[in-house]
Regions:
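His-Asp-centered metal-binding catalytic motifs of divalent-metal-dependent phosphohydrolases/nucleases
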Residues: 26-44, 54, 75-83
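A broadly conserved amphipathic alpha-helix scaffold signal in soluble, globular proteins
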Residues: 56-63, 77-80, 100
Length: 174
């Protein structure tokens, strides 16, 4: 999952250039690294989605490491919104959302220069990612069946993951 998070950072940075956005780079980096920290986490009676649970943990991380309120709030919002069906408002939230959706299902791959994709994919291995992520999503959908993640899973996330052009690149390189 760490390589997924790092790829998200790389893809988010590329999308920032393409989309003409100027995110808070530190907040975006932290959000990218921590966005799946609660995927499959224990039950939480208050939060109905791992993204919201993870947002709280990521915000706490920023505060514990002397981050300012603004950064903590951006990280929280960015992590909380990364599973939204539509791209959320706000530079950081939009960039992580689109990067995570690209890495998982290939969404927006045509927006990127193929060389950029080659560099990222050759630098940060995705071997085993689809199986690991699918396993975690199954757990997540059982723990929080009303969550956005569970709804996306039931709506065909796994076939979209298997059809991801990035995932097919791994298979063809073996």
């Amino acid at each position: 999952m760490l390589m997924h998070s790092v790829r998200c950072w790389q893809y988010a940075s590329a999308f920032a250039v393409i989309d003409g956005l100027r995110p808070d780079r530190e907040a975006l980096y932290v959000a990218c690294l921590l966005h799946d920290i609660a995927l499959g986490a224990e039950q939480n009676p208050v939060a109905g989605c791992f993204a919201v649970i993870g947002a709280g943990r990521a915000e706490e991380f920023v505060r514990r490491h002397e981050g300012d309120d603004r950064t903590a709030q951006i990280v929280h919002e960015t992590v909380a919104r990364h599973m939204d069906v539509e791209t959320p408002m706000g530079s950081e939230a939009a960039l992580l959302h689109d990067a995570a959706h690209l890495d998982v299902s290939g969404r927006r791959i045509r927006d990127l220069d193929p060389h950029c994709v080659d560099v990222i994919e050759s630098s940060y291995t995705r071997e085993g990612f689809a199986a690991d992520f699918a396993s975690r999503m199954k757990i997540e959908s059982r723990r929080r069946p009303q969550s956005t993640a569970a709804t996306l899973w039931r709506s065909g996330m796994y076939p979209a993951m298997k059809a991801n052009p990035l995932e097919r690149r791994v298979i063809s390189s073996k």
